């Protein structure tokens, strides 16, 4: 919360414009994801800089060259989306939990990206989201979904991954891109405004041919293991030139 206040204070003269512009992007009829994403990326970089947050990205070259893939990162908190929005060079949308639908700025950003809200307590609605994401990925949209289903409150430790979150990838036969977030909980969860560095590692994609014979819980375990290994490896680095 302290860092959010810092961001707002340091950008107070721009915040009204940012909010109005993002709101407008999400409501106009001629939806243009690339233009929306470019502006939101610009705002995100400004907010992170104002909040004294540095993003280090690794493995950007692992992002598939062709659209129609899904990012599967670990989930540490509300700042996670801002890490990807600054770091990722290609537009993507997000599947987010319904509970954050009314968080200021986030809801405007999600609307501008045509993100999809999922109600974890409503099985029927969850299935509809899976089906919708499947069809949109087939059409070349990129998505991000958190396979833990909720954020871990144990720092860089992961919660169990839910196999059901991988159903869209299996049905769309698309690349699965595991992503490891390190210290993404610190900017918003710690009561501090001291400079902080967050790392994001894009791991090599898992192509459909590699997982088509596996059940979704098995895929979930493989992705979780890859992310845990990346967190252990990159957490030990004092400094590595990011990609």
Predicted region positions:
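Short low-complexity, flexible loop/linker segments enriched in glycine and/or proline
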Residues: 72, 109, 133-135, 191-194
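Catalytic core of membrane glycerolipid acyltransferases/transacylases, capturing the structured
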Residues: 17-18, 22-24, 36, 50-51, ...
